[in-house]
């Protein structure tokens, strides 16, 4: 079983409009509300793929109850309740444009943060792999993800970590390393304080920097150009076919689902990387974020080749 962790989930509300009119009333007919957050995208894809998954994180108030109720019934859920209210994230789709209004979310009390660590520690007993995704809510220290990684390491569970900014920096600077990180070029540039290109020789040098020491897998997303990966002392490039992308949002989360699944099933390097890339592409072909059509899985899988470089 895979444990997905979403520390700052949301109710994602979609308002489709032909035109967004400013300073007047806009009436929406077709409103969509879903359980949102990067970790919950991972959860949905794992469930659709057929893997057993347990979802956890922080929820609060009536919106928190709504969120838990709107997670697929096939998914096991064990969220931790806090005093603050779970946030809304609103996307206004007007024409070819998308305007987002994102609430800050709840401020987590120090004791709630400590209590969740105990909750997380107990959940580790029943899972084989952990996937931690997304931002931290206000109130939690910047090194909170490092604390989660430390507990997972102590329990002997591999961790796929998909966060960015100060939270990722804190993990990289701590002695407690995740099994996998999945930065993109922009995030690598932010971490190193210099521009990082997609040149393979440069990426090889970058991923051998002391900052990344101790991390078994570093899978760099190159968007439409596939992925570049360092696993131990071996480097891989995966090229992907051109596809008709409908909605690329959530493709990174779908890739995390594939990585986590590969670790769960102890797949070879090539199998894990192909699965991760295929699930990312399948998400991009769908309108709904964090959703894959498994009927198209094998056709894409057969087109991908992993090259050692």
From Swiss-Prot:
Pathway entry: Carbohydrate metabolism; D-tagatose 6-phosphate degradation; D-glyceraldehyde 3-phosphate and glycerone phosphate from D-tagatose 6-phosphate: step 1/2
Residues making up the signal peptide according to the UniProt record: none
Origin superkingdom: Bacteria
Keywords for this protein: ATP-binding, Kinase, Lactose metabolism, Nucleotide-binding, Transferase
The keyword Nucleotide-binding is annotated on this UniProt entry: yes
Keyword Nucleotide-binding listed: yes
One GO term of the biological process aspect: lactose catabolic process via tagatose-6-phosphate
Pfam families recorded: PfkB
InterPro entries referenced in this protein's UniProt entry, alphabetically: Carboh/pur_kinase_PfkB_CS, LacC, PfkB_dom, Ribokinase-like, Tagatose/fructose_Pkinase
Reaction catalysed by this enzyme: D-tagatofuranose 6-phosphate + ATP = D-tagatofuranose 1,6-bisphosphate + ADP + H(+)
Any one Gene Ontology cellular component term annotated for this protein: cytosol
Top-level EC class as recorded in UniProt: transferase
EC number(s) given by UniProt: 2.7.1.144
One function term, GO molecular function aspect: phosphofructokinase activity
UniProt similarity note: Belongs to the carbohydrate kinase PfkB family. LacC subfamily.
HAMAP family in alphabetical order: LacC
Protein known as: Tagatose-6-phosphate kinase
Organism this protein belongs to: Streptococcus pneumoniae (strain P1031)
